[in-house]
Curated annotation (Swiss-Prot):
It holds the Pfam family F-box_4. The keyword Metal-binding applies. Residues 214-242 are annotated as: Disordered. Transmembrane segments: none annotated. GO terms for molecular function: ubiquitin protein ligase activity; zinc ion binding. The modification Phosphoserine is found at residue 379. This is F-box only protein 30. GO terms for biological process: chromatin organization; chromosome condensation; chromosome segregation; gene expression; protein ubiquitination. PROSITE patterns: FBOX (PS50181), ZF_TRAF (PS50145). A zinc finger (TRAF-type) spans 49-108. Part of a SCF (SKP1-cullin-F-box) protein ligase complex. Interacts with SKP1, CUL1 and RBX1/ROC1. InterPro entries: F-box-like_dom_sf, F-box_dom, Fbxo30/Fbxo40, Znf_RING/FYVE/PHD, Znf_TRAF, Znf_TRAF_N.
Amino acid sequence: MEEEVQQHSHCVNCVSRRCMTRPEPGVSCDLIGCPLVCGAVFHSCKADEHRLLCPFERVPCLNSNFGCPFTLARNKVAEHLEMCPASVVCCTMEWNRWPVSYSDRKSYESLSRDADEVSQLDMALALQDQRMLLESLKVATMMSKATGKISKPREQISVNSSVQEVPRANGLVSADEESYGALYEATVETTRSLAAALDILNSATRDIGMLNTSLQGTTNEMDEESNRESSQDRNAKDQDHLDEGEIGAVGGIDYTGTSQNAQAEQNGSSDLLCNLNTSSYDTSALCNGFPLEKMCTQVKDQDQNFHGDSTESNITNGDCVEADGTSEPPSSLLVAEQLKEGSALPDSTYQHILMPDEDDDEDLCWKKDLGDSKDVNGSPLSHATSFKFLSNSWYIPKEDKAVDTSDLEVAEDPMGLQGIDLITAALLFCLGDSPGGRGISDSRMVDVYHVDFGTQTFSLPSAILATNTMVGEIASASACDHANPQLSNPSPFQTLGLDLVLECVARYQPKQRSMFTFVCGQLFRRKEFSSHFKNVHGDIHAGLNGWMEQRCPLAYYGCTYSQRRFCPSTQGAKIIHDRHLRSFGVQPCVSTALEEPSRNCVLGLRSDHLSSLPFEVLQHIAGFLDGFSLCQLACVSRLMRDICGSLLQSRGMVILQWGKKKYPEGNSSWQIKEKVWRFSTAFCSVNDWKFADILSMADHLKKCSYNVIEKREEAIPLPCMCVTRELTKEGRSLRSVLKPVL
């Protein structure tokens, strides 16, 4: 370009169509017109520049990198973009459904019984959403949840022995037989319906809030009592107090010699003896409020086993541990430790109670209720040797290994899963994996360590489904090629487990965790999207709750009758739903004259007169069909498939499929794997709707088998008729009956 400018210094600034300058080498050149006859006149040296601006120059489509094969004039690009096969729009319309409650299960089973024979739009859409929901889940024989997050310590200490022990219905395994039995019965009852899953989630969330509120109130009371301590305990104000969430179970890891010496120097004494008596006993010596120098413990054997029968160990004259590790004579009162197997508090917290010893009235023993819990490795929880809390390491070194909870020895199928259908079980465990649901393990704090406890003890059937996503994040792609079924053994799943009623919740509004959200996800050409959104979501979806598809008022009792109240303005056309395309469509009216010859055809004779037409004629006829009809026509025969394939560039759309390519160096990148051509599921636009010519619903109620009239001819006395009443000539009057009451 620079050479041209140097050679033609005149042409650089010349824009006149009537330039009279004579051509001179290196100065100017001749004037020429546009070869494509766009009307432009310019110097011949500017021909390449004009091609960049000429409106008649043929250029590839702007979406050529996305698969559009068309090359067209520059002035036709804007018009082409409206029908460009690569200009694809994805519909992001969302709707929500509630799971079917337990009380409605029977009625929904009867409604789903004849779903294939009776074409009901609301039932077809609900079953489609259910299939897409189940296909989006993963098949698993054991429900697993791989979470890398660190759970907060859930060990809490209570100072009141009268805390109400409410069994938590969150899937935790309790060691107490009574509480576990109640939890087992509640779990068996709740898992038989999807509504029970909602109760599990709600009750779990509510119990957590109530427990936290109770513990916070208890902590405040202890702080107030600690401020009113007697003068005997005022020297302990500068001591370090342990936080309630950090104490965990009684008995932590052993002190090192350095930590013991530092603690002894801080107390001003080399021993850790305490002087307690029953007269000065108050809540300040408990939990959050007690000073460390008042606590003396007896060294216990670390190999002591606490599971099995409950045992008590009352030691009133044990030796105190000094800073140097030696023992002193029993010159003062020691705090003994009494371990007893008892019922666990909600959330598996440990309850510590300070109570007098039976052997010595002046002694106080520390009683601890520890459930027979087991960690995921199967070993029983071993109690530490003494009350030693200070530590810089709060976590046990972890390692990755495949474990299960079979060592908990819970009976097979404890939740009664064999009594419910696969759909209810799949949706139940889908809810269980949501926030507040059941996990396979739970991290708790025991002996100042975080230990993972098993919480799921049942093996799921091979067809039970589990998911790694939250409930609110599960999306249903309604397009034909969008959802890739992941079921190894697919089944029809005809029993409806989702509510027929669609719930619309704005995106900025919070949704219930037990509500399933579905996304349309269909792909359309840009010019087809407006009609799809108006007809499908604005007209059909909005009318499924009683306007377009009107059900019998007795449908709750099992009546499956329904009628289509609205239909397109075209005479005889009706709305249908195709299960394979997962989309709605318009079926035009078929004349009875066209159906008669097919009934009289003799087997063996050629009755397909349409296929005998020339290819060009068939191609012209197919050009008048919409995308929904072309998808149906392509499944008729190979000839019709070839005809529809010839219309893909003009009527179809192209979708890019990406694949991950790995290089020898080790890095990878995403590249276009292939370009897929297909038709959209859009149908011809319906501008007007009209009422269908059908009978009234009252005519159906006259012969509805569920409309049983119950005549009550026997008089039913009022509650107040049991008292003394006056009699009149006509008999018992209501006024006389009510008079004594008034």
